[in-house]
């Protein structure tokens, strides 16, 4: 399955959905989601992982890069609908306090 990144903006919240693998292969599409066509300043980001089947360390790095580039505080990036193995990987990497 090819990975697909979709995004929408509701006021100051950016919504990004990842389908497929969340890894280095989506780097450009993921960066475009939060750098192109932004209509207003972003205060929070919601990342929906309902259709994401895998996340590796490069996917985790992409999340940290998003947070840094948008200069968001802790809790301003929310991951929703994580599969258990993705949640476990984030916990093992001690990234749970970032998202």
Model-derived regions, located:
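Amphipathic alpha-helical interaction surfaces in cytosolic regulatory modules
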Residues: 21-99
């Amino acid at each position: 399955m090819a990975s697909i990144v979709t995004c929408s903006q509701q006021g100051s919240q950016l919504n990004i959905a990842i389908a497929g693998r969340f890894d280095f292969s989506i780097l450009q599409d993921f960066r475009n989601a939060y750098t192109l066509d932004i209509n207003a300043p972003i205060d929070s980001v919601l990342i929906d992982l309902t259709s994401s089947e895998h996340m590796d360390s490069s996917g985790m790095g992409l999340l940290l890069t998003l947070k840094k580039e948008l200069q968001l505080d802790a809790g301003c990036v929310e991951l929703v609908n994580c599969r258990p193995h993705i949640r476990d990987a984030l916990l093992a990497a001690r990234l749970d306090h970032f998202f």
